[in-house]
Swiss-Prot record:
Organism of this sequence: Homo sapiens (Human)
Site (Glutamine finger): Q573
SUBUNIT field: Interacts (via domain Rab-GAP TBC) with RAB11B (in GTP-bound form).
UniProt protein name: TBC1 domain family member 8B
One BP term from GO: vesicle-mediated transport
Keywords, sorted A to Z: Cytoplasm, Disease variant, GTPase activation, Repeat
Amino acid sequence: MWLKPEEVLLKNALKLWLMERSNDYFVLQRRRGYGEEGGGGLTGLLVGTLDSVLDSTAKVAPFRILHQTPDSQVYLSIACGANREEITKHWDWLEQNIMKTLSVFDSNEDITNFVQGKIRGLIAEEGKHCFAKEDDPEKFREALLKFEKCFGLPEKEKLVTYYSCSYWKGRVPCQGWLYLSTNFLSFYSFLLGSEIKLIISWDEVSKLEKTSNVILTESIHVCSQGENHYFSMFLHINQTYLLMEQLANYAIRRLFDKETFDNDPVLYNPLQITKRGLENRAHSEQFNAFFRLPKGESLKEVHECFLWVPFSHFNTHGKMCISENYICFASQDGNQCSVIIPLREVLAIDKTNDSSKSVIISIKGKTAFRFHEVKDFEQLVAKLRLRCGAASTQYHDISTELAISSESTEPSDNFEVQSLTSQRECSKTVNTEALMTVFHPQNLETLNSKMLKEKMKEQSWKILFAECGRGVSMFRTKKTRDLVVRGIPETLRGELWMLFSGAVNDMATNPDYYTEVVEQSLGTCNLATEEIERDLRRSLPEHPAFQSDTGISALRRVLTAYAYRNPKIGYCQAMNILTSVLLLYAKEEEAFWLLVAVCERMLPDYFNRRIIGALVDQAVFEELIRDHLPQLTEHMTDMTFFSSVSLSWFLTLFISVLPIESAVNVVDCFFYDGIKAILQLGLAILDYNLDKLLTCKDDAEAVTALNRFFDNVTNKDSPLPSNVQQGSNVSDEKTSHTRVDITDLIRESNEKYGNIRYEDIHSMRCRNRLYVIQTLEETTKQNVLRVVSQDVKLSLQELDELYVIFKKELFLSCYWCLGCPVLKHHDPSLPYLEQYQIDCQQFRALYHLLSPWAHSANKDSLALWTFRLLDENSDCLINFKEFSSAIDIMYNGSFTEKLKLLFKLHIPPAYTEVKSKDASKGDELSKEELLYFSQLHVSKPANEKEAESAKHSPEKGKGKIDIQAYLSQWQDELFKKEENIKDLPRMNQSQFIQFSKTLYNLFHEDPEEESLYQAIAVVTSLLLRMEEVGRKLHSPTSSAKGFSGTVCGSGGPSEEKTGSHLEKDPCSFREEPQWSFAFEQILASLLNEPALVRFFEKPIDVKAKLENARISQLRSRTKM
């Protein structure tokens, strides 16, 4: 590798380097201790340790080339190499391309300048594409060289970054280097002859956290496959931890959670991931989440500055954050002040000429924001003016529409109940009013106490709007939060939900989108629409709005449109309940965008098939309970109770457990504070019921106590009519219990748990996501093992180890082949057995690792035939059940079962003639040849193929599962178990010849090799004579004489001699009658030979084989 020219003092360097070659201008040196017998003794040992500790390139590149000039002790290092061949190439290139040119220069300075320029040019050309995005390309090139030489990971494994740290091996810290790449965490250390190499793939990490104890002040704890690893002594531990967390989550999502990963094109190509890119992505995600911006926004600049707050008459210190389409500000001095300015709202951007370095941003509505002490404010103003010019024509202005619509209380004339025959016409009509406005218009003439309180709330908000502004760019302060906690007025609820959730921005950037999606989704029929239709009448059935076709049609349109927009989610139960509440207070199009905000940004991964997001937040909730309510965790040792109880809280934002008039106040807080509000309220509810819960003897009693509490939560200020309020319908029995006002409960949750920061929740979400997905994977494994264990003799522990190896091989092959198609077949929604399937290439690797017959010379052919036998539905993939059935027979099968397996491998559909194109490789098959032969299948009629495909995968290609098809498949599998040996087809002569060759290969190097050879020769001779006698009645000539003589005369033939005879024989039989054997004939003949019976019934230690396979699975591919 060419190096950036750096000065080296040769006088000191000679103690550590030995001269190999030299000329007038260059010196080739070798590191002391490298390439010497015994490693160079003590000197070599110390040099090696020094190189490792100081991160010297010489550890992995013990050769180097220096540029020298006469009469100077200062030399320049220009190249290094990992081995003699690599450095020799560089030396030869210098002699052929540089040496002749140097003689024309007059001065040594000109020579040095020319060499430096030439080497820098080579480095620039070499790293033009690879290292341009790194902070220090030169150091990164050196680290990459060490990473590649030390670990031998795949060529396309992308090194993201590296850190100096200590790895704790027991109680001893080992100083070394931690390398973080897209798929692996790797560590290398070399101290006084002791070398430590550690490779952990991210898919194995179940726990990643920062810890501290008496010995380690701060360390990073990594748990992988039950083993704990601790790394400490980082220079920037928070930065390191953040990157490790991102890489682990990225790998987990790519391999286990493809539902969300496929929607994330930024991370789809592992080769594009860089340290800087990951850091920028993390900052952008936090920025978007905090300000509720669309997912596509990325943080471009951050400036510390002061913002003038006009209604309070002071400057608040904070950070101005700028993305492509937004300018945002968040205070950092405890004032809880934030501002979001969409560039589409900006009219002018000016700067002041005084020393205040001020930027003034004027927006629609005669509002201006003044930012002081902005660094590089002149450049910033120029950039923002350019962006505003580009942004002004892209958006549809809806902020004024929101304000105007919220003041309108008159019902629309468009809402009439339609008959079933005109339902399609009704579906086309998009509601332009919130359902609450239509079904519960406020009557200003009959003002009761509740209506007066509602009017006072509205007046409070109008005062706030006068001070802080109204619309997207309003100041959001502590006063805003206080008003939200008290409950948003009915008339303003839809508008403020849109603002606080950020849905107003989505709607502005996508004008007419909803109308188009409604039209496109109209009339579609799939699993999602069927489920939607089933749940429409279950959505707030007690509310008049959803007892009429007006509300039902609106709900149908919103849910169907969203399922059409996001087919990865489609429709999930609980979405109907949430959407019903949104439609009560927001227009139909606004309700759609609120649903988008909830499902795609505020509650990510909540509404996919495995509700991973909800499970993650449950784990976060459990962690918060341990921290804030320790006495509860001590009493209820099984934390799964909280998970089961809280699931509906998170999925429906408490709507399913609280009366509707109280639940909407919770939704108010959710749209303002996000998931933080739900977690705080959950803690407050448990805290309020703490004494009751501590006296509960079991989970059922605890659930009853909580349900009774929820029934008694009220909203005394709710203006909803009594026929709509659910809290007013409680029975007399329940009224004896203390009532709790929702406003008081929310206020208490803010006072007690308001110090929980969003950053902490984000960190806990990332940390627990690993645990949740690995737990789901463990559940999948246990279900697979439970099904498979019924059909095999392997113990559960052996099956467990076999499954780990099976799955590991799948992932390793994906790491070594980035475009591996097998990952595309992984679908967590499929039945457990179908989630992980391997192709022929991966099966061959596992066969070589695990099969007791893998020593055979034709092991590739055996692996291929076994794969073809197991691949009954001809999709070139096999699952774990099929794989384990073959392994089980090889290890635990009886003599008859093993022989039957070998027999079936040598007849169709498993058997196909195999011959490598490269004669020098013998029976070894290339990847392409293996793929080709695995796809050669016995031809079947088209209709039979379709029937087979449907039979083996009844759930594929259909909207819903076909129960009849599953029952038919189950019945077929029962028949398969009762398969009679008499049903097996006969084996023809070419297949029998290959069968005989396979047996000879299996017996090779066995302790009883000679007796086995003699026994198989006797059996073969006997079979051929039997066939000859049987055919004499039909043919006067003996077609098998030549073959019989060959085998009988061989006695104990060598493998090579046997192979040559067997290959020649088929040619001599081509024009003669074909002979064949039944399985019973072969079985009876082999049973007569004790040596053969002993060979196949010899016990094999499957545990040792599995242990060895687990260890060597990664080592065989790397330099471990």
